[in-house]
C-alpha cells in the first residue's frame, strides 16, 4: 500500500454518497498541478473521506478551496462512456487540512496592490501566510520571543505524575 501527500485545489464541491453496504463517503475531486519541462499539467485525484470524518470542515470546502490531503493511494480502473479503458488515482483520506496557499483571490490581489503601491522594490517585501506584509527592515528590531509563555498557569492536576 502506498501513502502520499497531495496539495491542490478542489475541482468541485464535495459530494456525499452512500455505498451499496450503507457506508457514507464524501468524494472530493482534487486537481494537483505538476510541471513537466515548461508545460503545466493537472492530475485529477478522487479523494474518499469515509464515515463522519471531517464533518465540521466539509461546509467550508468549496470548489477552488486549496487543501492538503494525506492518505492511502490506489488506482481505480473503469470504462469511459465511449468504451475505452481508463484509470483514476484514488486517495482514501487519512488527514485533510486547508492549504495556506489557497485561493482567496480578491484578498490576495488587494494585498499585492497595496504592497506594490507602498514600495518600489520587491527585494525586501514578501507576503506571509495570512497575507500580511513582511518587511525585513521593519521587523529586524523586534524581539521574536516577546510575550512567549506569558499568561500560562499550571495547576498540580495538570501534571501526570
Curated annotation (Swiss-Prot):
Spell out the subunit comment: Homotetramer.
HAMAP family with a match to the protein in the record: SSB
- What protein name applies here? Single-stranded DNA-binding protein
**Molecular function via GO:** single-stranded DNA binding
PROSITE patterns cross-referenced by the UniProt entry: SSB
User: Record's Pfam families?
Assistant: SSB
Q: Is Hydrolase among this UniProt entry's keywords? A: no
Q: Which GO terms describe its cellular component?
A: nucleoid
**What keywords sit in the KW lines?**
DNA-binding
Q: Which domain of life is it from?
A: Bacteria
Q: Does the keyword Acyltransferase apply?
A: no
* CDD domains listed in its UniProt record: SSB_OBF
Using the record's annotation, list all stretches that form the SSB domain.
Answer: 1-100
> Do you know which SUPFAM superfamilies this protein is assigned to?
Nucleic acid-binding proteins
Which Gene Ontology BP annotations are present? DNA replication
Question: What species is this protein from?
Answer: Chlamydia caviae (strain ATCC VR-813 / DSM 19441 / 03DC25 / GPIC)
Amino acid at each position: 500500500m502506498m501513502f502520499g501527500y497531495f496539495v491542490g485545489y478542489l475541482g468541485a464541491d464535495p459530494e456525499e454518497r452512500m455505498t451499496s453496504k450503507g457506508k457514507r463517503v464524501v468524494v472530493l475531486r482534487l486537481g494537483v498541478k505538476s510541471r513537466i519541462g515548461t508545460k503545466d499539467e493537472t492530475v485529477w485525484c478522487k479523494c474518499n473521506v469515509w464515515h463522519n470524518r471531517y464533518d465540521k470542515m466539509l461546509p467550508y470546502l468549496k470548489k477552488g478551496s486549496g487543501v492538503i490531503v494525506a492518505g492511502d493511494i490506489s488506482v481505480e480502473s473503469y470504462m469511459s462512456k465511449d468504451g475505452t479503458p481508463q484509470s483514476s488515482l484514488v486517495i482514501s483520506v487519512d488527514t485533510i487540512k486547508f492549504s495556506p496557499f489557497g485561493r482567496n483571490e480578491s484578498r490576495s490581489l488587494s494585498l499585492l496592490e497595496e504592497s506594490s503601491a507602498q514600495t518600489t522594490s520587491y527585494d525586501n517585501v514578501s507576503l506571509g501566510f495570512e497575507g500580511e506584509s513582511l518587511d525585513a527592515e521593519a521587523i529586524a528590531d523586534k524581539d521574536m520571543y516577546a510575550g512567549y509563555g506569558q499568561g500560562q498557569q499550571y495547576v498540580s492536576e495538570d501534571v501526570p505524575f
